[in-house]
């Protein structure tokens, strides 16, 4: 295939000294580390929406992107051309996976029946390409936020007709995700939240959200979909306050409604930023609670208060992210999906490759540094020593449950003074830099 990206050949690993912009400097998919290839460890995925449907439109200006597959006038012809362009891109960049929203791959019709017919046509085309492609589907999802019908939300809408439509749309999205061999299914509630509590029954909306998710679980069982269900936290945008604010918020919701046995989380770096968390914080909280399912790999601008979805190029960030993934034991069904878009001024088709190469190299380098940090137990050894007071004596009594307030008071009264030790943050940050910049 060489129709839409004629100026780009297959992207290959050439090493860190290469001056070829269309090559991997750190991502060698065939390199074996700890018994698995880099490709198997990282499980990279291309986001269909940012890569093939985004046109550069923003609130202040029109489309800028040069996308040769968009020259048709019929929306279905554009959708078919996008499939051709997508698989040419997947092949040239050697992508293991891609992700999609239902409305990314096929246009809406005038009715739900017509929309589903459009989906069936494009899904059949994608299935044909999948037969000869190494690329697979990491996850599918439904766009329950763009159409004006979702102005008050989808499953949390005050309008029961919208709830019903949303259910029908997710039903179809689950079916096509299963049909395409998707390994996960994602729920992101962009409109599941509120602008003001003056007109909102929060308790009822959360109850309905849970009812909706239970229906999805039941239908997945009915059709035999064995993929992992994921919720993607985000605190705001487009809604002022979204119900899936952050990992802790999502986990509390899942536990309250007896959904935690079915769901994990898909964590996006830029969404962590919007929740005023470090990316690693969200990953760590999910990991220690056993719900880290997948990652949307991007980054945000710390000086801006909205979701910029930039390609991740900060090796420190990717290292600390992959540190959590490695400590988890690696991905199961999840992966690293580049929910990232080239900048509005990076409008040429070739920029799509350059953006993904930058992100893939950044995570590959981060993975290798993180693997060495874990193997050398750099932080583990320090942390074990820092909490050593709980290994014996009164600390061991606290951990085992032997201690109570009376015994702890007696112990405290008998101590003349408390001696703390330094946290050595600066030392650890310096050691991290040693690993980051080691040759």
Swiss-Prot record:
Similarity remark: Belongs to the xylose isomerase family.
GO CC aspect terms: cytoplasm
Source organism per UniProt: Thermoanaerobacterium thermosulfurigenes (Clostridium thermosulfurogenes)
Entry EC number(s): 5.3.1.5
Name of this protein: Xylose isomerase
Binding-site positions, Co(2+) 2: 268, 271, 307, 309
GO biological processes: D-xylose metabolic process
Taxonomy, superkingdom: Bacteria
Gene3D superfamilies associated with the record: Divalent-metal-dependent TIM barrel enzymes
GO molecular function: magnesium ion binding; xylose isomerase activity
UniProt-listed InterPro entries: Xyl_isomerase-like_sf, Xyl_isomerase-like_TIM-brl, Xylose_isom_bac, Xylose_isomerase
Keyword Iron-sulfur: no
Cofactor binding, per record: Binds 2 cobalt ions per subunit.
PROSITE patterns from the UniProt entry: XYLOSE_ISOMERASE
Subunit note: Homotetramer.
Positions that bind Co(2+) 1: 232, 268, 296, 339
Subcellular location(s) per record: Cytoplasm
Keywords of the record: Carbohydrate metabolism, Cobalt, Cytoplasm, Isomerase, Metal-binding, Xylose metabolism
Pfam name, any one: AP_endonuc_2
Enzyme class: isomerase
Residue numbers annotated as active site: 101, 104
Catalytic reaction(s) noted: alpha-D-xylose = alpha-D-xylulofuranose
The keyword Metal-binding appears for this protein: yes
Predominant cellular place of this UniProt entry's protein: cytoplasm
Cofactor dependence: Co(2+)
């Amino acid at each position: 295939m060489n129709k839409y990206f004629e100026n780009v050949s297959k992207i290959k690993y050439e090493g860190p000294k290469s001056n070829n912009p269309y090559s991997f400097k750190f991502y060698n998919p065939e390199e074996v580390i700890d018994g698995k290839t880099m490709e198997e460890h990282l499980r990279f995925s291309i986001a269909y929406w940012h890569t093939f449907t985004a046109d550069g439109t923003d609130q202040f200006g029109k489309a800028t992107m040069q996308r040769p597959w968009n020259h048709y006038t019929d929306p279905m012809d554009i959708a078919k051309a996008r499939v051709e362009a997508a698989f040419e891109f997947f092949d040239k960049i050697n992508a293991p996976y891609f992700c999609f929203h239902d409305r990314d791959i096929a246009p809406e019709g005038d009715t739900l029946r017509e929309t589903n017919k459009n989906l069936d046509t494009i899904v059949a085309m994608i299935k044909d390409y999948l037969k000869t492609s190494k690329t697979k589907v990491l996850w599918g999802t439904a766009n329950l936020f763009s159409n004006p019908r979702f102005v008050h939300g989808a499953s949390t809408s005050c309008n029961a007709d919208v709830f019903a439509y949303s259910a029908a749309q997710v039903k179809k999205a689950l079916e096509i995700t299963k049909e395409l061999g998707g390994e996960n299914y994602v729920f992101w509630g962009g409109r599941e939240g509120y602008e003001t509590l003056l007109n909102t029954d929060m308790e009822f909306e959360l109850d309905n959200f849970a009812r909706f998710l239970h229906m999805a679980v039941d239908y997945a069982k009915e059709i035999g979909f064995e993929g992992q269900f994921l919720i993607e936290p985000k605190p705001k945008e487009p809604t002022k306050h979204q119900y899936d604010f952050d990992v802790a918020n999502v986990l509390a919701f899942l536990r309250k409604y007896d959904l935690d046995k079915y769901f994990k989380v898909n964590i996006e770096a830029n969404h962590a930023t919007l929740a005023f968390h470090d990316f690693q914080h969200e990953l760590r909280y999910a990991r220690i609670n056993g719900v880290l399912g997948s990652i949307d790999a991007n980054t945000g601008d710390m000086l801006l208060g909205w979701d910029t979805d930039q390609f991740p190029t900060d090796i420190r960030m990717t290292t600390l992210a992959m540190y959590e993934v490695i400590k988890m034991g690696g991905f199961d069904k999840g992966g690293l999906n580049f929910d990232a878009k080239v900048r509005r001024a990076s409008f040429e088709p070739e920029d799509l490759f350059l953006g993904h190469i930058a992100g893939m190299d950044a995570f590959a380098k981060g993975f290798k540094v993180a693997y060495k940090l874990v193997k050398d137990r750099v932080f583990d050894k320090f942390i074990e020593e820092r909490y050593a007071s709980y290994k014996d004596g009164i600390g061991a009594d606290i951990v085992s449950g032997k201690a109570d307030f009376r015994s702890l008071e007696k112990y405290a009264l008998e101590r003349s003074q408390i001696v703390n030790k330094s946290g050595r943050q600066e030392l650890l940050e310096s050691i991290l830099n040693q690993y980051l910049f080691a040759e």
